[in-house]
From Swiss-Prot:
GO terms for cellular component: cell surface; extracellular region; phosphopyruvate hydratase complex. Its EC number is 4.2.1.11. (2R)-2-phosphoglycerate binds at Q163, K337, R366, S367, K388. This is Enolase 2. Mg(2+) binds at D242, E285, D312. The active site is at E205, K337. Its cofactor is Mg(2+). Component of the RNA degradosome, a multiprotein complex involved in RNA processing and mRNA degradation. Its main location: cytoplasm. Belongs to the enolase family. Keywords: Cytoplasm, Glycolysis, Lyase, Magnesium, Metal-binding, Secreted.
Amino acid sequence: MSKIVDILAREILDSRGNPTVQAEVILDSGAEGSAMVPSGASTGAREAIELRDGDASRYGGKGVLKAVENVRGPIKAALTGMDAADQAAIDRRLIELDGSDNKGVLGANAILAVSLATAHAAAADAKKPLYAYLNRSGEFLLPVPMMNIINGGAHADNSIDMQEFMILPVGAPSFREALRYGAEVFHALKKVLSDRGLATGVGDEGGFAPNLPSNEAAIGIILEAIEKAGYRPGEDICLGLDVASSEFYSDGIYTLASEGRRFTSEEFSDHLAAWVDKYPIVSIEDGMAENDWHGWGIHTDRLGRRIQLVGDDLFVTNPAILKQGIEARIANSILIKVNQIGTLTETLEAIHIARKAGYTSVVSHRSGETEGTTIADIAVATCTGQIKTGSLSRSDRIAKYNRLLKIEEELGDKARYGGRGAVKNLA
């Protein structure tokens, strides 16, 4: 038993230059663990609540000094002396201490920083890397990266309504090769955009953010880049979308403002299904809005046996909401974002529930990231087989990919790459 003897916290900056929380947990053995908390731009209405100061004189009101003080004060007092190896008890105590149903009292950012830092400390005490410490099956799976190479929506200041256009190197023989495939397509895409006189600046997640005549035009340009890089669309590399449709859904209507088009739920599902017929799209995230469960039913009936349908804003990594979705037979996959739910234990529970129901899980970053690499270890430890952590630029994104390269090297033939079998309905 390694007892917690100290917990430190500080206000740091994320990849958008906004404050976030970092925590360190120190054990009586001398082992230490540290974790930094990300932050989203397009957030689900039912996500756990991050605590911001609201003081307009500091960071435009986005400071997190209150959350930091909650770590240094009540959280430290409550956890000191507890066994860091008992993650479930640590997280249960944090939830009880907060007392709300959305972690809004202490702040999900304060709670998550300590929850993850505790796991890192316990892993260090066990003299294991985090992925090995968290793994329970003895099997390890390197994830297929879902690389967001064109950014739109809330992640970029451009004309594209939909948030992410991704490539999935499902045909690669290893994670290392998958990363190479993606990087080569990324650079080919930059050349395609430049040759057309389009902007090659990047958005929050490192993907390009050009102004295009339509959302569909982004797909065409990516397919051109895949072929230019020497790969076969649909074989070596497939496509994924994060529609983030809650961002443009109101009063029962989906509005693609850049195209001047409006759709009912059924019409928008038809629109996405037509793209699946036409292009090698194998995964669609948040194709329907989080509150349009009727639309999700239509969407799942239409595409749920053909491709992967991922719920992000729909499920917000919440085990209880996921169970409701499974009972309603909507979607067939869940996006896993640790800060949506706020503790490691609940995150792992969501992955377990999804797997038991035959749903896939995609471990994900947030648009406001840090150099922390915890999600890379979680993806490998839980064998989800998929990770979404941005494009092939910006060190806040590349840090996760580089961590996965190191994990792959450490595991050698003890691990395999997820490939086509990791994506729902693709194997």
